[in-house]
Amino acid sequence: MVMMASAPFLPIVSDAIAAQRLSPSALAYFGDAVYELFIRFIFLTPPQRINAYHHQVVAHVRAESQARYMDILWPHCTAAELTIFRQGRNAAADGPKRVPAKIYRQATGFEALLGYLYLTDPQRLQDVLALLEQHIRAEVAAAESL
């Protein structure tokens, strides 16, 4: 499978003031949209049926995947980023019953971090997404080689 090369996928405008006014839950809500658009972007090629796109995207936007990706990001995060992650994690409500609460909270913290970075530091967001993309591509390549 060929995926699109890394490139800025959104017109990002920094707005630190807006980010400071948002609750951790609101940052997570926004970060969820940022992350899903990023995942959709990297799986856009080669052309496939919509159902195939959907299955690929869902596999990567699930709470379990997001929690795993946060584990990958953790050592690369600044103290301020980890604070945003913790605030998002701690603000998480109980998620769906199919997902353990710890995983759901970690995924919510991950989303809050992405939402915060989108609003405050677009270049850092691109760096974080590039790191995630490397891991996602490696996972996809490993799965295809089976």
Curated annotation (Swiss-Prot):
<comment type="subunit">
    <text>Homodimer.</text>
</comment>
<dbReference type="InterPro" id="IPR000999">
    <property type="entry name" value="RNase_III_dom"/>
</dbReference>
<comment type="function">
    <text>Involved in correct processing of both the 5' and 3' ends of 23S rRNA precursor. Processes 30S rRNA precursor transcript even if ribonuclease 3 (Rnc) is inactivated; Rnc processes 30S rRNA into smaller rRNA precursors.</text>
</comment>
<keyword id="KW-0460">Magnesium</keyword>
<dbReference type="GO" id="GO:0019843">
    <property type="term" value="F:rRNA binding"/>
</dbReference>
<keyword id="KW-0699">rRNA-binding</keyword>
<dbReference type="Pfam" id="PF00636">
    <property type="entry name" value="Ribonuclease_3"/>
</dbReference>
<keyword id="KW-0698">rRNA processing</keyword>
<dbReference type="GO" id="GO:0004525">
    <property type="term" value="F:ribonuclease III activity"/>
</dbReference>
<keyword id="KW-0963">Cytoplasm</keyword>
<keyword id="KW-0255">Endonuclease</keyword>
<keyword id="KW-0690">Ribosome biogenesis</keyword>
<dbReference type="GO" id="GO:0005737">
    <property type="term" value="C:cytoplasm"/>
</dbReference>
<feature type="active site">
    <location>
        <position position="32"/>
    </location>
</feature>
<protein>
    <recommendedName>
        <fullName>Mini-ribonuclease 3</fullName>
        <ecNumber>3.1.26.-</ecNumber>
    </recommendedName>
</protein>
<keyword id="KW-0694">RNA-binding</keyword>
<comment type="similarity">
    <text>Belongs to the MrnC RNase family.</text>
</comment>
<dbReference type="InterPro" id="IPR036389">
    <property type="entry name" value="RNase_III_sf"/>
</dbReference>
<keyword id="KW-0540">Nuclease</keyword>
<dbReference type="InterPro" id="IPR008226">
    <property type="entry name" value="Mini3_fam"/>
</dbReference>
<dbReference type="GO" id="GO:0006364">
    <property type="term" value="P:rRNA processing"/>
</dbReference>
<keyword id="KW-0378">Hydrolase</keyword>
